[in-house]
Amino acid sequence: QMALDVGAQSFGHWSGCHSVQWDFNSPNFGDRNIADLFQKHSYPFGILVNILGERFLDEGADFRNYTYAKYGREVLKQPQRIAFQIFDEKTKHLLRDEYNIPQVSKVTANSIEDLAEKIGISPTILTKTVSEFNNSIVDTAFNPTLLDQKRTEGIFPPKSNWALPIDTPPYSAFAVTCGITFTFGGLRINSRSQVLENDDNPIDGLFAAG
């Protein structure tokens, strides 16, 4: 804002950002000992629900490499800016290392009802969500290494790949929010990193990078 106030030219897509699912209880500032392990990127192998107990996106739309940078923003749109990634015991071995750090926001329970109570969601609604999801899964082979088309039918949002029933206790829920890595908007610069005015002339002594 200080640069804009002295006449710097804005540039880029200011309403967009690189946004990931980030541990809800992570600190406000980074920890070099943990680095990026507060991210939570194994969501394709479970379901994602908001505080109302409702799914709100296709967890298996594509490999996480192609969805993780935009799904954080979808969490940001949810009530209280929080969501829960839910897994059961049979997918536990598929979770990335970041799910095992001591600081992780994790809740476990032996039933969906108990899990819901522990994370502050209506047990009735979460049980209904999980039941509808489980009953909608097409009976095809599961393969985590490819787009296996093991999908749901008849529910919205769908899950396009890696749809396994959530039916094997214990169940785990990981609280996530949106972590913004960087925005897509900034200041226009030239090849020497000088910040430009609206007429494309450089502002003396003002440089930008990053």
Predicted regions and their residues:
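Residues forming the flavin
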Residues: Q1-D148, T152-G210
